């Protein structure tokens, strides 16, 4: 278990300074909730990079939600697939028939800077890295290219929480709620 030790029989302990050596500190500051809502409201199309044909994958679950419960034109990017959920799959962002407003990424960390460069090259408006994805190099590439950036957030959860749909996934923890929030966004 990554070198974190539990002291004095405690069930949970904070890591010591030596436990987190070599782990880069998060310095990038992401958009606020109203800013994320504005990104979602401005968007008309979303490209899902790393979309999967496997129903057990998070990208598949997010894709089904976006197709059934969100107003976006959804495009799938996966060079190994021909169709996903009955829609064509494309080998790259450059192969899409439109420039996507949001590039939603389900790829491993090492691939994120390259996806950010590709999003800038095609003229996308936002780079969205899913839950668990945090890459400051990719964020810098995208921001330097004029894109909005969201990291470590699920586009499905964010859309659902702003539109009262979290109950569809069973979320109601108090931190993320199924109740509609009144958030004003600048357009």
State what each model feature region is.
Residues 26-32, 83-113:
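Glycine-rich, highly charged phosphate/nucleotide-binding loops
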Residues 136-159:
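Short acidic, glycine/proline-enriched helix-loop-strand junctions
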Residues 69-72, 122-127, 145-147:
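A short helix->loop->beta-strand "cap" motif at the edges of active sites that frequently abuts
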Residues 47-49:
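Conserved beta-strand elements of the Class I
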Residues 158-187:
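A charged, well-structured terminal subsegment
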Residues 2-23:
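Helix-enriched interaction subdomains in cytosolic or periplasmic regions
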Residues 52-57, 64-84:
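NAD(P)-binding Rossmann-fold cofactor-contacting core
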Residues 119-142:
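ADP-ribose/adenylate-binding Rossmann-like module
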